[in-house]
Amino acid sequence: MISAQNLVYSLQGRRLTDNVSLTFPGGEIVAILGPNGAGKSTLLRQLTGYLQPDSGECRLFNKPLNEWSITELAKHRAVMRQNSHMAFPFSVQEVIQMGRHPHRTGNQDNETAQIMALCDCQALANRDYRQLSGGEQQRVQLARLLVQLWEPTPSPKWLFLDEPTSALDIHHQQHLFRLLRQLVHERQFNVCCVLHDLNLAARYADRVVLMQKGKVIANGKPQDVLTQQALTMLYGADITVLKDPANHSPLIVLDH
């Protein structure tokens, strides 16, 4: 379980999170949605311990984040940021194996190979990470996070992803979310991601959190949260919300 109580954070006089309280029990994919500047990435950084709020508290497994050592926290949660640039010429395989850093044991070649296959990175193994496309880098970063959290097995782990599909083609978007569902169901992973694609959230998330101007304005199942009234008010766009005939999830369509 991860929880946030009364999170407040301001920067240059602007409230980026405004008295945010949330509890995620785990065993699900959570999508945080909202317009640009809503506070989504700021909230994610607070939930992961990378950003200390001005007031309020985050807990992981009922223990305050500031009471975890850096190493122990890294064994229980991993974070993909929006940008993961590197200045030095590491190969893809070397970048992925960096996920082993919190663990005392060395590189596990079989484990790394398995995860590279899961993330469709085998053909990239010997390439310079800096020369990859944005989508290829996102796949490599996901593999690095999985190496970081893969053991001990099984045990509850949290995976935080900030716009993980921003550079992925449609095939790899589908592949990513099918993999995340598999990890949730088979390996006790819990997933929290910031997304802009409403239909991906509607199709794959178990829970959706809507944010606006630093506040959480809705939190629940996609079919309860992603309504035409709520989304029109939140985004100011002309949309229609239909029902996907395949799985009855919301289907958001832009009006002409």
Swiss-Prot record:
EC number: 7.6.2.-
MF-aspect GO terms: ATP binding; ATP hydrolysis activity
EC supergroup of this enzyme: translocase
Gene3D superfamilies reported for this sequence: P-loop containing nucleotide triphosphate hydrolases
Membrane topology: Peripheral membrane protein
SUPFAM superfamilies on file: P-loop containing nucleoside triphosphate hydrolases
Binding site for ATP: G34, P35, N36, G37, A38, G39, K40, S41
GO cellular component, one term: plasma membrane
Pfam family, one: ABC_tran
Major localisation: membrane
Key words of the record: ATP-binding, Cell inner membrane, Cell membrane, Membrane, Nucleotide-binding, Translocase, Transport
Localization annotation: Cell inner membrane
Cystine crosslinks: none
UniProt domain ABC transporter: residue ranges: 2-238
Quaternary state and interactors: The complex is composed of two ATP-binding proteins (HmuV), two transmembrane proteins (HmuU) and a solute-binding protein (HmuT).
Family to which this protein belongs: Belongs to the ABC transporter superfamily. Heme (hemin) importer (TC 3.A.1.14.5) family.
Role, per record: Part of the ABC transporter complex HmuTUV involved in hemin import. Responsible for energy coupling to the transport system.
Protein name per Swiss-Prot or TrEMBL: Hemin import ATP-binding protein HmuV
Source species taxonomy: Bacteria, Pseudomonadati, Pseudomonadota, Gammaproteobacteria, Enterobacterales
